[in-house]
Amino acid sequence: MKHYSIQPANLEFNAEGTPVSRDFDDVYFSNDNGLEETRYVFLGGNQLEVRFPEHPHPLFVIAESGFGTGLNFLTLWKAFDQFREAHPQAQLQRLHFISFEKFPLTRADLALAHQHWPELAPWAEQLQAQWPMPLPGCHRLLLDESRVTLDLWFGDINELTSQLDDSLNQKVDAWFLDGFAPAKNPDMWTQNLFNAMARLARPGGTLATFTSAGFVRRGLQEAGFTMQKRKGFGRKREMLCGVMEQTLPLPCSTPWFNRTGSSKREVAIIGGGIASALLSLALLRRGWQVALYCADEAPALGASGNRQGALYPLLSKHDEALNRFFSNAFTFARRFYDQLPVKFDHDWCGVTQLGWDEKSQHKIAQMLSMDLPAELAVAVEANAVEQITGVATNCSGITYPQGGWLCPAELTRNVLELAQQQGLQIYYQYQLQNLSRKDDCWLLNFAGDQQATHSVVVLANGHQISRFSQTSTLPVYSVAGQVSHIPTTPELAELKQVLCYDGYLTPQNPANQHHCIGASYHRGSEDTAYSEDDQQQNRQRLIDCFPQAQWAKEVDVSDKEARCGVRCATRDHLPMVGNVPDYEATLVEYASLAEQKDEAVSAPVFDDLFMFAALGSRGLCSAPLCAEILAAQMSDEPIPMDASTLAALNPNRLWVRKLLKGKAVKAG
């Protein structure tokens, strides 16, 4: 059975207060002066003090083979802050640190280890505050107002490096080859790792490591590094440094899912909801010039306009990509929302998903069998549900303690206001009719004979995304739905968590003393007219799921308060994020893909045209990470997702999967 949690570090603290691994019988850092050793070996060995001021790009990427207590990262972060203070006009503005850790410390052990270095306390406190739960895969932490990005990959580095997407090739400016000593942890120090380091290293990229072991030096040389010995720190005689001087040929392992970015830094986003708002922020942070075209007279008038939306992950025992994406998207969303400098109504009160019939009970039992971290999801027995949620349901279920609700409309409006302060230009009542290539740019034609020309375009306009010739064949569909707004009652006011059943019910929003209950589901419909049938069905589903609950029968929908919207969805419940694929060219180029995989060309796409769509009913959970993924792809920066899960987000995936099996593909 696939496990979705990571084992924490098994450690103790010695007499000097230094953490020691029980499994590897080795210290995490030197008893003498671990901080100075880090500065000497990794910062000095990679000549960062000299390279930072001369770096010709706005981003410097460093990768590390063992995160441990984070000493290397914290020391580097402090040094980077000092560099930026001394060189405010330097080209280099942001730091990206990628690290792998098989056995992450608990937050408590991390804080205890950090007490060793009071001079690093301001940086350590930020790291501890965002320390992720023990889930496999990549956890992106945005630190220091997003000037510093930390990608923590939890799992075995020799397994993870084979799961990295090709887009990470030749991105790393410097390697910190760290970890327990080769004699203590020989399984990590492999030729497989050395080869992966070479594949990821940028031409001219460097490496440094504390060891001078001969097999390490020879292995790195075989991988392509030019190696040399340097005086070791303190009592250690020697250490190793290296440079990637040659450019290695790097064939794409899965060209049909290849992602391409853009050399340009000017973009038009078509939208007006949560997707376009969060993407605007992510691109502005990377130095893009961003314009947003919204068809409505104000933002969040479409699917992002609800008063309350639930935040919790979508999990399934039988879909690894779904689990990997939504579990990491959920934890990223919580970190992102918690540090977002805008106000919006929300309450991280928890979400409880109830087994109201045999089918839903079986589904929950399967989720609970996946060895999920307790921080993510825990079982709740029927007799405990009332205590946790505040209302009696006579059902058992699964609770997401870090979930809750937020106001999507308010979030979208205020994020866009923040983005405007950072340079975003917004044009309201601009309905895009069509777009076409003109002189290496995109010509946008709007209703009313308005036109605009932009270097890059992102379509983030929800269910309207397939209305253009370039996107008309996308396998997405519309879902119309109605959310009912109901006044609270004395019993409903006791509801402390979001309830999910064959619908959902939120606790009251203190701002208006109303709850949200929903939502109806009409696949293929774009009708946004109020429906009395939907209003009654929202109430009836609640009563049907909890027939013994008197509070459910007291729900009042008679005032006809509701909101209707239309979502964009896919049959595999995953978003579509990336290049807009060229349908006709895909069918031509991949006509014989099943028999000729080795000869496959890169995925046919429209140049400088991207999409961010099909968020379905989980946009609040998926949008923050999707925005980060797309902004990173467009900017040719490291993407926080493994290759197979990233492929599951590719807009061409449903076509390519059929073509790989030699099956016919139909549009739409």
From Swiss-Prot:
Region (tRNA (mnm(5)s(2)U34)-methyltransferase): 1-245
Keyword match Cytoplasm: yes
Cofactor: FAD
One BP annotation, GO: tRNA wobble uridine modification
PANTHER family membership: SARCOSINE DEHYDROGENASE-RELATED, TRNA 5-METHYLAMINOMETHYL-2-THIOURIDINE BIOSYNTHESIS BIFUNCTIONAL PROTEIN MNMC
Sequence segments annotated as region (FAD-dependent cmnm(5)s(2)U34 oxidoreductase): 270-668
Family statement: In the N-terminal section; belongs to the methyltransferase superfamily. tRNA (mnm(5)s(2)U34)-methyltransferase family.
Pfam families recorded: DAO, Methyltransf_30
Catalysis: reaction(s): 5-aminomethyl-2-thiouridine(34) in tRNA + S-adenosyl-L-methionine = 5-methylaminomethyl-2-thiouridine(34) in tRNA + S-adenosyl-L-homocysteine + H(+)
Name of this protein: tRNA 5-methylaminomethyl-2-thiouridine biosynthesis bifunctional protein MnmC
GO terms of molecular function: flavin adenine dinucleotide binding; oxidoreductase activity, acting on the CH-NH group of donors; tRNA (5-methylaminomethyl-2-thiouridylate)(34)-methyltransferase activity
This enzyme's EC code(s): 2.1.1.61, 1.5.-.-
Function: Catalyzes the last two steps in the biosynthesis of 5-methylaminomethyl-2-thiouridine (mnm(5)s(2)U) at the wobble position (U34) in tRNA. Catalyzes the FAD-dependent demodification of cmnm(5)s(2)U34 to nm(5)s(2)U34, followed by the transfer of a methyl group from S-adenosyl-L-methionine to nm(5)s(2)U34, to form mnm(5)s(2)U34.
Gene3D superfamilies for this protein: D-Amino Acid Oxidase, subunit A, domain 2, FAD/NAD(P)-binding domain, Vaccinia Virus protein VP39
InterPro entries named among the record's database cross-references: FAD-dep_OxRdtase (IPR006076), FAD/NAD-bd_sf (IPR036188), MnmC-like_methylTransf (IPR008471), SAM-dependent_MTases_sf (IPR029063), tRNA_MAMT_biosynth_bifunc_MnmC (IPR023032), tRNA_MNMC2 (IPR047785), tRNA_S-uridine_synth_MnmC_C (IPR017610)
Source organism per UniProt: Shigella flexneri
Compartments reported by the entry: Cytoplasm
Record keywords: Cytoplasm, FAD, Flavoprotein, Methyltransferase, Multifunctional enzyme, Oxidoreductase, S-adenosyl-L-methionine, Transferase, tRNA processing
Cited NCBIfam families: MnmC_Cterm (TIGR03197), PRK01747.1-1 (NF002480), PRK01747.1-2 (NF002481), PRK01747.1-3 (NF002482), PRK01747.1-5 (NF002484), tRNA_MNMC2 (NF033855)
Any Gene Ontology CC annotation: cytoplasm
